[in-house]
UniProtKB/Swiss-Prot annotation:
Cellular compartments annotated: Secreted
Name of the molecule in the record: Lutropin subunit beta
Oligomeric form and interacting partners: Heterodimer of a common alpha chain and a unique beta chain which confers biological specificity to thyrotropin, lutropin, follitropin and gonadotropin.
Signal peptide: none
Family affiliation: Belongs to the glycoprotein hormones subunit beta family.
Species of the source: Struthio camelus (Common ostrich)
Length: 128
């Protein structure tokens, strides 16, 4: 790394550090026949990890994942919901992100998932 070029949190310059990034997600509910594509911010980027040469019988070091530091929720209404059904959904918006152990009770830190734009509603995204 040239002098004067900082390396954020030990992450090489070729890999962006953990930060809020724009994403498009599919908002859906069981009572509504179609999804709504929503642009929001989520946390993405790399966190410094270490793999020791020596394997301790006490276990390995805690690996960190990029997750929410602070967030707020935006409420949106889905189109075409059944009469009497609540059409509103809450979409998280990342205000800040941080590297920490994955909170397995509230987050999905798997290698690959369905993806944020997956829509399981019968009518999909409806007419565009």
């Amino acid at each position: 790394v040239p002098l004067g070029v900082p390396v954020a949190l030990g992450v090489p310059p070729s890999r962006p550090p953990c930060r809020p990034v724009n994403v498009t997600v599919a908002a859906e509910k069981d009572e509504c026949p179609q999804c709504l594509a929503v642009t929001t911010t989520a946390c993405g980027g790399y966190c410094r990890t270490r793999e020791p040469v020596y394997r301790s019988p006490l276990g390995g070091p805690a690996q960190q994942a990029c997750g929410y530091g602070a967030l707020r929720y935006e409420r949106l209404a889905l189109p075409g919901c059944a009469p009497g059904a609540d059409p509103t959904v809450a979409v998280p918006v990342a205000l800040s992100c941080r590297c920490a152990r994955c909170p397995m009770a509230t987050a999905d830190c798997t290698v690959a998932g369905l993806g944020p734009a997956f829509c399981g509603a019968p009518a999909g995204f409806g007419p565009q």
